[in-house]
């Protein structure tokens, strides 16, 4: 019955139109894009030209409309001839200023559109960093972040995941450059060239420039960073990268992008990782010196298929990128765990790999529950409605990741488990390779694959309406294997019992005995679960203030996940004020990281449990060091805009 509801919601044509683009991308086919740019660190701009090879899909197309945001348009040429017949339409937030270019009536086949442009100081895709603020302090630094709708502030484009193109990229800079393509040899000093033969959308165009050095981390992988931190980066990733690729290839199909490299960016990078093709951009918080955060690289690798080869047609269907990627990431992590267990002679290695996958899913489920509690309900559905002019950055959360994963996990279980579901994985990615799709097409291909295998009734039984458009938690609560989580839960229960007993004798707790054998994710689960349980029970601040002396490991940890969870536990329930060292240290830490996963909850924590004035003054102190995207989102969180 709910499938009938879905069919009534279907657009007349799939994939449906992207409401976050001002462009008329549906009217054109792009066979190639040439991006030729120069970086000025003095002026803090990128300038140059973009050349498109375009074919109108209908003969009566009279204009082309591209997305721009805070760009300066210098000159336009059509088939080499200058054109003044264009208009930069008045800006409309948050989608920028459409660039409308009239086409000559003589154009009836493929044509070339060339646009000279320059970014401005309002560009939201770029962050320039003074050399004094870099780790090495030897050169300034520049990096881009175009997802979701920020490519339009870097160059005029069809800024939507709904259309793709191969790219040739050329950049001139006084410092080494990386872009989201395969490097090409060039004899020009200070000029760097890249080729991306696989069609990609605009949000995957990436640029970085600075004092970059590199080191091998596998036969198909290189890590780049500032020279000063290179050896730490190499150690963090060299053990796992090739293993990740091989497990992923066994699950899906051969890696098509040739190289899977990574760039560890300065601390202001606002995300954990960004899956730019051939060169994943990653936060330095991954360099935890215990390899515990390397799973983020498994996630970014999975994007090489989910997101980069097969792409959501618009940000309303973002779960198709991220839900699939989390699903593949956990299969990769489980596969690695099984292989390691087998190498140690474990008889039930495959089962252990599944336990690892389920443990990761439990941690993810907890983050989903937390997200549902704090988000605007309209952003907790699997498919968003952004048709009223909503900024996709406002909708960003763990929902598409974790609700999307749980939807796929539920479908996997519904059709009979891994053995039945696994053949669908390569089928899906081959069918939509190089294309963009919506959720309706995903449902269609599920039936296309499983109906001939006698599974149509299983799919019919799915609450499609509840899963796809329902707000809050999904309609079906997953059943995960709790084996690796039980140890964490037992310690949580012990603390809750102690808190309820009103005892002051803490001798029953000991760091080595309690948490000494925990793996990094178990630390995170323990801290988050303890925070949740203490939130339901009025724990005394005296107990909270004893925790640092019992578990000094947490205070000393360099793992961002642990540090964030630990400080939430202390500050929420410890009744600390602005002068307490716990609060001061946490506030200073917020100034050293730019990853929004930590920064945004951090300021919300200070605002709610210390003081709004202190949160704002701390943010003001560090505001200039944050990326434009992060800066805007924190301002919204603190009601500053």
Swiss-Prot record:
Main location: cytoplasm
Taxonomic superkingdom: Eukaryota
UniProt entry tagged with the keyword Protein biosynthesis: no
GO cellular component: cytosol; nucleus
InterPro entries the record matches: Aminopeptidase_N-like_N (IPR045357), Aminopeptidase_N-like_N_sf (IPR042097), ARM-type_fold (IPR016024), LTA4H (IPR012777), LTA4H_cat (IPR049980), M1_LTA-4_hydro/amino_C_sf (IPR038502), M1_LTA4H (IPR034015), Peptidase_M1 (IPR001930)
Family annotation (Pfam families): Leuk-A4-hydro_C, Peptidase_M1, Peptidase_M1_N
GO molecular function terms noted in the UniProt entry: aminopeptidase activity; epoxide hydrolase activity; metallopeptidase activity; zinc ion binding
Cofactor(s) this protein requires: Zn(2+)
The UniProt record lists the keyword Transmembrane helix: no
EC number: 3.4.11.-, 3.3.2.10
Cofactor mode of binding and number, as noted: Binds 1 zinc ion per subunit.
Localization, UniProt: Cytoplasm; Nucleus
Gene3D superfamilies linked to this entry: 3.30.2010.30, Neutral Protease Domain 2, Peptidase M1, leukotriene A4 hydrolase/aminopeptidase C-terminal domain, tricorn interacting facor f3 domain
Gene Ontology BP annotations: peptide catabolic process; proteolysis
Protein keywords: Cytoplasm, Hydrolase, Metal-binding, Metalloprotease, Nucleus, Protease, Zinc
Positions of the catalytic residues: 300, 401
Residues reported in the UniProt entry to bind a peptide: 145-147, 270-275
Class of the enzyme per the UniProt entry, highest EC level: hydrolase
Binding residue positions for Zn(2+): 299, 303, 322
Catalyzed reactions: an epoxide + H2O = an ethanediol
Family: Belongs to the peptidase M1 family.
Function, as annotated: Aminopeptidase that preferentially cleaves di- and tripeptides. Also has low epoxide hydrolase activity (in vitro). Can hydrolyze the epoxide leukotriene LTA(4) but it forms preferentially 5,6-dihydroxy-7,9,11,14-eicosatetraenoic acid rather than the cytokine leukotriene B(4) as the product compared to the homologous mammalian enzyme (in vitro).
UniProt protein name: Leucine aminopeptidase 2
């Amino acid at each position: 019955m709910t499938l009938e509801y879905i069919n009534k919601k279907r657009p007349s044509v799939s994939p449906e139109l992207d409401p976050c683009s001002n462009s008329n991308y549906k009217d054109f086919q792009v066979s190639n894009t040439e991006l030729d740019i120069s970086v000025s660190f003095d002026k803090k701009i990128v300038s140059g030209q973009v050349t498109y090879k375009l074919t109108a899909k209908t003969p009566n197309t009279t204009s082309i409309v591209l997305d721009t945001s805070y760009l300066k348009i210098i000159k336009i040429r059509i088939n080499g001839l200058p054109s003044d017949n264009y208009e930069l339409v008045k800006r409309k937030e948050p989608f920028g200023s459409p660039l409308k270019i009239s086409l000559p009536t003589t154009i009836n086949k493929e044509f070339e559109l060339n646009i000279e442009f320059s970014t401005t100081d309002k560009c939201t895709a770029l962050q320039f960093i003074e050399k004094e603020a870099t780790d090495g302090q030897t050169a300034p630094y520049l990096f881009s972040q175009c997802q979701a709708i920020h490519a339009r502030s870097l160059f005029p484009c069809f800024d939507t995941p709904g259309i793709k193109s191969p790219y040739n990229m050329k950049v001139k800079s006084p410092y080494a450059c990386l872009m989201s393509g395969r490097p090409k040899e060039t004899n020009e000093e200070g000029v760097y060239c890249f080729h991306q033969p696989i069609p990609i959308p605009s949000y995957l165009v990436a640029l970085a420039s600075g004092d970059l050095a590199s080191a091998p981390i596998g036969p198909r992988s290189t890590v780049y960073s500032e020279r000063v931190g290179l050896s730490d980066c190499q150690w963090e990733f060299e053990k796992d990268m090739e293993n990740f690729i091989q497990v992923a290839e066994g699950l899906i199909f051969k890696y098509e992008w040739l190289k899977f490299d990574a760039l560890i960016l300065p601390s202001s990078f606002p995300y954990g990782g960004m899956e730019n093709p051939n060169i994943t951009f990653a936060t330095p918080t991954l360099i935890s010196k215990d390899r515990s955060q390397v799973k983020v690289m498994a996630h970014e690798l999975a994007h090489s298929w989910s997101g980069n080869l097969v792409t959501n047609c618009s940000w309303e269907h973002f779960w198709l990128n991220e839900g699939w990627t989390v699903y593949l990431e956990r299969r990769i992590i489980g596969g690695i765990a099984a292989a390691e267990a087998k190498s140690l002679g474990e008889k039930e290695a495959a089962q252990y790999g599944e336990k690892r996958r389920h443990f990761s899913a439990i941690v993810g489920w907890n983050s989903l529950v937390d997200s549902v509690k704090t988000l605007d309900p309209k952003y907790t559905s699997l498919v968003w409605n952004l048709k009223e002019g909503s900024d996709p950055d406002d909708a960003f959360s763990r929902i598409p990741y974790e609700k999307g994963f749980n939807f796929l996990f539920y479908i996997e279980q519904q059709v009979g488990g891994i053995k039945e579901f696994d053949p669908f994985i390569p089928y899906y990615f081959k069918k939509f390779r190089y294309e963009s799709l919506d959720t309706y097409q995903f449902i269609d291909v599920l039936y296309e694959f499983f109906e001939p295998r006698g599974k149509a009734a299983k799919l019919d039984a799915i609450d499609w309406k509840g899963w796809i458009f329902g707000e809050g938690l999904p309609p079906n609560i997953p059943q995960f294997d709790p084996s690796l989580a039980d140890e964490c839960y037992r310690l949580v229960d012990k603390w809750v019992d102690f808190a309820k007993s009103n005892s002051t004798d803490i001798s029953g707790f000991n760091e080595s005995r309690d948490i000494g054998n925990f793996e990094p994710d178990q630390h995170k689960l323990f801290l988050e679960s303890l925070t949740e349980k203490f939130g339901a029970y009025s724990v005394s601040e005296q107990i909270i203030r004893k925790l640092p002396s019992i578990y000094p490991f947490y205070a000393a940890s360099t793992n961002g996940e642990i540090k964030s969870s630990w400080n939430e536990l202390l500050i929420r329930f410890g009744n600390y004020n602005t002068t307490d060292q716990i609060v001061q240290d946490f506030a200073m830490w917020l100034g050293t990281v730019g990853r929004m996963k930590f920064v945004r909850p951090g300021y919300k924590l200070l605002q709610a449990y210390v003081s709004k004035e202190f949160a704002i003054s701390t943010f003001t102190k560090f505001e200039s060091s944050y990326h434009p995207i992060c800066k805007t989102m924190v301002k919204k969180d603190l009601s500053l805009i």
